[in-house]
């Protein structure tokens, strides 16, 4: 019974690793895509040369194909190549990402074994002449917690870099852009500000001050 329980416990941790890795890659693809939409100059190596909100206001729509391959390059393959693509795109990457690339690659390889071969060596699992099933890879609790801590730190550092340097307040401005057809009919900036504040609170469950919402309205209207 104890052996079976330990195998099950290990299998749970391996699946937690699979989820952790998938969540991290989903986060990366989202925040990198958001950076391109907010700062389209990244696509041509000209940071801050174009305001993404200005493009939207002028009637231009983003085609995901414009930066789909860039996102793929930053989220697939081994971590040396991913980091290289991120450096070429954003100019630099957080030191925590560089320091963690070896562990990230170990995590990537193990994640692939879980996703494609039930936690076993992929190539050996495809050897159909085998007469026995290989044991699953082992992931100790201590190592899994180490991976969790590492991912949290790296995600936080990437978030800070891209939010500060490329994304800024793109999201609330984009939300106002979607509201604009109805907001433009309001008589004054105060009414538009309240419309934005209520919409953000109702749709996104975020709380922004009146002053910030007023700034969003003013910034957008002056573009």
Please provide the spans of the model-predicted regions.
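Helix-loop junctions and short alpha-helical segments
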Residues: 1-110
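Generic marker of "main functional regions" within proteins
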Residues: 33, 37-46, 114, 124, ...
């Amino acid at each position: 019974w104890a052996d079976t329980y330990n195998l099950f416990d290990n299998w749970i941790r391996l699946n937690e690793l699979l989820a952790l890795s998938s969540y991290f890659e989903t986060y990366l693809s989202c925040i990198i895509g958001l950076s391109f939409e907010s700062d389209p100059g990244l696509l041509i190596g000209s940071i801050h040369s174009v305001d993404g909100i200005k493009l939207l206001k002028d009637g231009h729509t983003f085609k995901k194909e414009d930066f789909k391959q860039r996102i793929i390059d930053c989220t697939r393959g081994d971590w040396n190549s991913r980091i290289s693509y991120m450096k070429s795109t954003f100019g630099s990457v957080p030191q925590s990402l560089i320091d963690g690339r070896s562990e990230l690659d170990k995590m990537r390889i193990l994640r692939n074994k879980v996703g494609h071969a039930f936690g076993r060596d992929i190539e050996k699992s495809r050897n159909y002449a085998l007469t026995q099933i290989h044991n699953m890879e082992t992931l100790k609790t201590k190592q899994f917690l180490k991976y969790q801590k590492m991912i949290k730190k790296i995600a936080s550092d990437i978030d800070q870099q891209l939010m500060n340097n490329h994304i800024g307040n793109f999201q609330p401005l984009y939300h106002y852009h979607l509201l604009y057809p109805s907001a433009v009919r309001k008589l004054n900036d105060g009414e538009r500000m309240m419309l934005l504040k209520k919409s953000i609170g109702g749709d996104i469950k975020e709380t922004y001050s009146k002053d910030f919402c007023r700034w969003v309205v003013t910034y957008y209207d002056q573009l």
